[in-house]
């Protein structure tokens, strides 16, 4: 069975797959100090709680936090006796081309999303991922990754407002009932929510104009459903896009061994 690990700046997700069949998933905070033994105890406890007695034979890792990769490698080797595939490393092949100035600088999560998007929707895509950063990744007609845009994440923007202005409280993001807020919280929520609606729409329109073609816009990430319901910003929402991409990359590497 395959264990796919998606390590982001905020959270790390572990998912079990039996071929293309999803089995289970768990989420924990990303902490670079966490040891291989701690990963195993945490994962084993959750598997036992769900009465999952399975043999993990393969591991694939995508990590935007380089410092955690070493301990995840040790975790895979020590407890599952397997050498994990790590997206972005030379021995992990991708089924799509990367056509940018510095391919090694592209975040692994963005490459994985490109693979997943092309597998599910074909080419000519703009992949919008609402994570710690809000990223826009452009997928060419043949599935190649050809660049993108990085903007501050929604929650990061809210936190920056709270940290930088003493009078502004910490608030959660939600769709406001009106654009004009009548209290501080509503004003902040309106500014961030509608500001990001405008940001997404403008960036996507400029990408389409620059590439002189119609492109489908696919959203993913924790806050994507909140924006998915707003003014037809996206052509589709895909939950667990990164995990799907990891399974595609794993299968591709197995087939090319």
Swiss-Prot record:
What Gene Ontology biological process does one annotation of this record name? coenzyme A biosynthetic process
**CDD domains in UniProt:** ASKHA_NBD_PanK-III
- Name the chemical reaction catalysed here: (R)-pantothenate + ATP = (R)-4'-phosphopantothenate + ADP + H(+)
Q: Does the keyword Cytoplasm apply?
A: yes
Q: Which domain of life is it from?
A: Bacteria
The main location is cytoplasm
EC number per UniProt: 2.7.1.33
The text of the family note is: Belongs to the type III pantothenate kinase family.
Q: Where does K(+) bind?
A: 129
How is this protein annotated for GO cellular component? cytoplasm
Q: What protein am I looking at?
A: Type III pantothenate kinase
Matching HAMAP family: Pantothen_kinase_3
Subunit and partners: Homodimer.
Q: Name one Pfam family in it.
A: Pan_kinase
Role description: Catalyzes the phosphorylation of pantothenate (Pan), the first step in CoA biosynthesis.
**Could you tell me what the cofactor note in this record states?**
A monovalent cation. Ammonium or potassium.
Pathway entry: Cofactor biosynthesis; coenzyme A biosynthesis; CoA from (R)-pantothenate: step 1/5
Q: Which positions are tagged coiled coil?
A: none
């Amino acid at each position: 069975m395959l264990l796919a690990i998606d390590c982001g700046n905020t959270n790390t997700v572990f998912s079990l797959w039996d071929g293309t069949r999803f089995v289970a998933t768990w989420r924990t905070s990303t902490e670079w100090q966490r040891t291989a033994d701690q990963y195993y105890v945490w994962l084993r406890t959750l598997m036992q709680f769900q009465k999952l007695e399975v043999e993990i034979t393969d591991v694939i890792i995508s990590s935007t936090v380089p410092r955690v990769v070493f301990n995840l490698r040790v975790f895979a080797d020590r407890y599952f006796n397997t050498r994990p595939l790590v997206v972005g490393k030379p021995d992990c092949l991708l089924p799509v081309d990367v056509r940018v100035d510095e391919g090694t600088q592209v975040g692994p999560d963005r490459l994985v999303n490109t693979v997943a998007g092309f597998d599910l929707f074909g080419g000519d895509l703009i992949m919008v991922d609402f994570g710690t950063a809000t990223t826009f990744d452009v997928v060419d007609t043949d599935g190649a990754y050809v660049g993108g845009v990085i903007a501050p994440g929604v929650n990061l923007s809210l936190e920056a407002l709270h940290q930088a202005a003493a009078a502004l409280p910490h608030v959660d993001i939600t769709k406001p009932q009106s654009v004009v807020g009548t209290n501080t919280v509503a004003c902040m929520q309106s500014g961030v929510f509608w500001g990001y609606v405008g940001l997404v729409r403008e960036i996507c329109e400029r990408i389409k104009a620059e590439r002189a073609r119609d492109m489908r816009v696919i959203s993913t990430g924790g806050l994507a459903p909140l924006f998915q319901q707003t003014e037809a910003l996206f052509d589709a929402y895909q939950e667990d896009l990164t995990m799907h991409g990891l399974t595609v990359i794993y299968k591709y590497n197995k087939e090319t061994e």
